[in-house]
């Protein structure tokens, strides 16, 4: 989840986490929120083993499931990922700003894929930035 979602927003292969301190910072923010919620629920993430901490060896160009869904113009599993963590955070009074931003960005990308922001036929339409 912590690498799947930011990669989908950026639209880049997973190598972005080795090549960008910014992508690493976003991933770490998501992971910290996940770990805080898990700890509050009595779940010991450290029991998941070393593999989950370092991940699997994959080509830098690999695209995880959420990005594959967006590429194919399908709706994603964001409600099961960030959506669930946001709900749990509210129940536990834990702030989840990284997950909230990620949730809304991916939902907006889904809307874009659905054609919501296609203004090609609206050349004369005016809007105001608020």
Residue ranges and their predicted role:
Residues 7-26:
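Active-site lid/adjacent beta-loop-alpha segment flanking the redox-cofactor pocket in flavoenzymes
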Residues 24-130:
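NAD(P)-dependent Rossmann-like dehydrogenase/reductase catalytic/cofactor-binding core
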């Amino acid at each position: 989840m912590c690498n799947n979602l930011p990669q989908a927003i950026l639209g880049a292969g997973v190598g972005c986490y080795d090549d960008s301190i910014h992508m690493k910072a976003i991933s770490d923010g998501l992971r910290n929120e996940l770990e805080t919620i898990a700890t509050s629920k009595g779940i010991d993430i450290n029991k998941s083993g070393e593999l989950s901490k370092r991940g699997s060896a994959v080509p830098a160009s690999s695209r995880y499931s959420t990005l594959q869904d967006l590429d194919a113009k399908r709706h994603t599993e964001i409600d099961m990922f960030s959506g669930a963590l946001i709900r749990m955070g509210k129940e536990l009074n834990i702030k989840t700003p990284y997950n909230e931003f990620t949730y809304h960005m991916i939902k907006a990308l889904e809307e874009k894929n659905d054609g919501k922001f296609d203004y090609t036929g609206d050349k004369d339409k005016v809007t105001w930035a608020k």
